[in-house]
Amino acid sequence: MEQIITEFISRFGYAAIFILILLENVLPIVPSEIILTFAGLMSVKSHLSILTLFIIATIASFIGLLILYYICRLISEERLYRFIDRHGKWIKLKSKDLKRANDWFKKYGVWAVFICRFIPVLRVLITIPAGVNRMNVVTFTVISLIGTTIWNFGLILLGRTLSDSFGMLMTGLHTYSRIMYVVIIIAVIYFAIRYIGKRKRVK
């Protein structure tokens, strides 16, 4: 996957960034941490402008997240889970990941949308419960764009700054992703235990 993405960017430049980032905001199978850090690297070693990369990535993110948001507004939560159970394997999406994003959204609302924009996979999945639960589109868009703008600029700048250590950078990003998954799992277990404890006390 990584090699395909980097070769695609090397060959098609800005157009590749736009297509990949748009897809990344609709499907969680295209990792933006690879796309944008490599784009930052290419801004050093080619004619690509860091400002143009940032603008293109932000516009593509905006279009992609709104596409997914409006799709999810049209379907119920039950139908969504049934679809993921049947077809999720083709887009590397599991019901438990979606449930995690949904639980975060219902518990934290706007803050969940903002914070999840900095967490691989969940940064895409959080759009689904926002759409299904019909979160105000203006609020959703503003919060998402703030988080996405910070994420995009940070990764592009990181790739540009550490262009001489790209291999080490990719390893570090993979480690970050794994750590975030562990943190999320621990948080879910913690809140589940608290919820069960409260129900037992009520009984």
Swiss-Prot record:
Membrane topology, record value: Multi-pass membrane protein
**Any Gene Ontology CC annotation:** plasma membrane
Of which family is this protein a member?
Belongs to the DedA family.
Organism of derivation: Staphylococcus aureus (strain NCTC 8325 / PS 47)
Q: Which Pfam families match?
A: VTT_dom
> Can you tell me where the transmembrane regions are?
16-36, 48-68, 108-128, 137-157, 173-193
**What start-end ranges are recorded for coiled-coil regions in this protein?**
none
Q: What is its main location?
A: membrane
What's the protein here called? Answer: Undecaprenyl phosphate transporter A
Q: What does this protein do?
A: Flippase that catalyzes the transport of undecaprenyl phosphate (UndP) across the cytoplasmic membrane, from the external side to the cytoplasmic side. Is involved in UndP recycling during peptidoglycan synthesis.
Mind telling me which InterPro entries this protein's record contains?
DedA_domain, VTT_dom
Query: Source gene?
Result: uptA
One example of a Gene Ontology biological process annotation: cell wall organization
| Summary of the knockout phenotype | Deletion of the gene does not affect sensitivity to the amphomycin derivative MX2401, which binds UndP in the outer leaflet of the cytoplasmic membrane and prevents its recycling. In another study, the deletion mutant exhibits moderate acid-dependent amphomycin sensitivity, but sensitivity to other antibiotics is unaltered at any pH. The double mutant uptA-popT is growth-impaired and exhibits cell size variability, and 10% of the cells have membrane permeability defects, consistent with impaired envelope assembly. The triple mutant lacking uptA, popT and SAOUHSC_00901 is not viable.
Q: Where in the cell is it found?
A: Cell membrane
Q: List keywords of the entry alphabetically.
A: Cell membrane, Cell wall biogenesis/degradation, Membrane, Transmembrane, Transmembrane helix, Transport
